[in-house]
Amino acid sequence: MSNSADQLDPIRLEIIANGLRSIADECFIALMRSAYSTNIKERKDHSIAILDKRGRLVVQAALTLPIHIASMGGLTTCVLEKYGVNINEGDIFIAN
């Protein structure tokens, strides 16, 4: 960033990060509560992450299992290769 106007101040950054983390946490809980699988419902064996348009991790739910996050890289690459030019703002991809 060449210009100080392009930089995000730390307070605003923290507010945005916490907002995104709250969204991920709410998605985690919603999936857990609505699941039929005991692995998800009782063992919490699932993960939620928010990625940017390049597939980089922005935030993950607090209870997310890191092993699941590690596998999202390959999945994201495949999604971007298949749908990249057709992905629009607000699109969501869910994978198992």
Q: What does each of the following model-derived ranges do?
A:
Residues M1-N96:
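Glycine/proline-enriched, intrinsically flexible loops and inter-domain linkers
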